[in-house]
Amino acid sequence: MKSIFITGIAGMLGSNLAYLLKDSYHISGVDLNKVQIGGVDSHLFSAFDLEKIRELFLQHKVDVLIHCAALVNVDECEEKPDYAQKVNYELTKNLAELCRELKVKMIFISTDAVFDGNKEGLYKETDIPGPISVYASTKLQAEQYVQQFSENIVVRTNIYGFNYREKNSFGEWIISSLNNNDNLSMFYDIYFSPILVNELASILSMCIDRNLCGLYHICSTGSISKYEIAIAIMEEFKLSGAIFQASMEDHEFRAPRTKNMGLSNEKISKELGIHISTPLEGVKEFKRLYDRRYHEQLKKG
């Protein structure tokens, strides 16, 4: 059984990975927030403590690191560029060097925001990035460093799903808001390729088992606007309330936003020989998970 170590194990991606993969691998990880999932060895300290990370790598005989920890608040990155550089680039660089030293494969979770959004259609791995925010720039720098080592994987993605912590994810926020009869304004002019975190976990498991390496876009098949996916969630969950169209052009942000974050998953789909859900198929599975009380099982660990 392979041993996998997860940074940011209490976050939405990290906790779902731990919960979903714990029966197939030995799972350990680190976070500043507490996480209790049966069969998972989680440790409460900063991923910046490389000596402790080294000790845990050796203790758990780690084969693969999935590096989820990051500063993902785009506006906070813009306000604190030095801190964003430290968390998103320097930490990743240090972990990549440790992985190289200890012969651990690294899977780096990156973002769809590395492109400038000016392309019509979906971005492929061969398209040239053009980050327009501090967040995107720091993640791209980290990507480039990690890719120096041929055994590693860089994953560009955009996820939604259920959160382990008492903090609503994007999808949960839509459900909660509509349940409270709140009116929502969603952007009709921002497009992305969101993938359900459960499906991403399954695909990452395939990547590990087949020892893939390189850069991959792991995302939904096709793209959708923020407004369209909110409407889809409302209809699938049979919620009342109102969702209004809004334009990114009418809002001021601290950090610039990318209008088109749509990614093509053709490369990973062909290499693994799989179909990845469209955004609307993903929403249907999101509802099925809700009906099966997956969110409650996840929180119980």
Predicted regions and their residues:
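NAD(P)H-binding glycine-rich loop region in Rossmannoid oxidoreductase-like domains
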Residues: 45-87
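Substrate-binding strand-loop-helix patch
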Residues: 164-165, 190-198, 218-236, 285
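Mid/C-terminal beta-alpha module of Rossmann-like enzyme folds, strongest
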Residues: 203, 210-253, 259, 294-300
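NAD(P)-dependent short-chain dehydrogenase/reductase
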Residues: 144-192, 198-199, 205
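NAD(P)-cofactor binding segment of oxidoreductase domains
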Residues: 79-107
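Catalytic helix-loop patch of NAD(P)-dependent Rossmann-fold dehydrogenases
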Residues: 86, 90-94, 114-155, 159-162
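N-terminal Rossmann NAD(P)H-binding glycine-rich loop of SDR-like oxidoreductase domains
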Residues: 2-24
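Amphipathic terminal alpha-helices
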Residues: 279-301
